[in-house]
């Protein structure tokens, strides 16, 4: 259930919202005979304030309450194996994480360039943390490591973000995004190990990292569109190890055919086959190195046909209005 109220007074506009959610979740693992029903409800207020500095620039101040629900894998108690010595087991007792998100932003438009910047702070309780520990057995003398998510931390994330849209020519558009943030986490995990000894793991850590994305769209002769997307996630540290940086490039070509009633596309996902999750794990008695790749390079050819409707460009002003509304709804519903 959701309600909102907004208005504009001169150069100042505001939008207030309130969302209510009532959730019911049941985990029924027949193999392990585990049944865990969960019920929770929450109110999610939001407020968006904007002041128009000039025809081409504005500042904004926003707040929203957000929820991050555990994925299916996080609540499934059935173990899945990355290898015979490294397994992941979900936690049916895990709860959603709740965040208070604040940001202040600035937007400026030039003839061919649009710059959007923001500084933000997110405070999260019940943050998910993956606890890695020895299961107590060995395979060929190597300890078996089990990875399980728990709600055991408070997380404060502070950062800034830049987004730049550059319409160089009618046939060439470029979009860039850069996001830098500091992540401070506090929490402890207490458990009894395989030797029946009580252990306390401290999960306090403070780390900086960043992410960037560049997207280009070029209109080639014969009405062929060429789009390229490149991303890079910087290395990250966490309490029990490190994760290497990840770079990846996707590329696609598309062309409208059959009097713009159909579109044929060719897409290459992860051209350089570099989207790999590489981790170094350091436990008190075990060090491990792992590589994981969900999907290797993929090439996809597709054809889309639109019945009774041609592909047409809508009014640019109407598109901008819809995009602005979509961003607000993304913040409200996230």
Language-model region placement:
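Outer membrane beta-barrel strand-and-loop segments of large Gram-negative receptors
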Residues: 1, 91, 95, 110, ...
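Transmembrane beta-strands of outer-membrane beta-barrel pores
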Residues: 9-11, 20-26, 63-69, 78, ...
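Repeated loop/turn-to-beta-strand initiation elements of outer-membrane beta-barrel proteins
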Residues: 11-14, 56-59, 112-115, 171-174, ...
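Residues on the lipid-exposed face of transmembrane beta-strands in outer-membrane beta-barrel proteins
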Residues: 3-7, 47-51, 104-108, 119, ...
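Surface-exposed extracellular loop regions of Gram-negative outer-membrane beta-barrel proteins
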Residues: 1-31, 40-46, 55-101, 121-147, 171-182, 215-236, ...
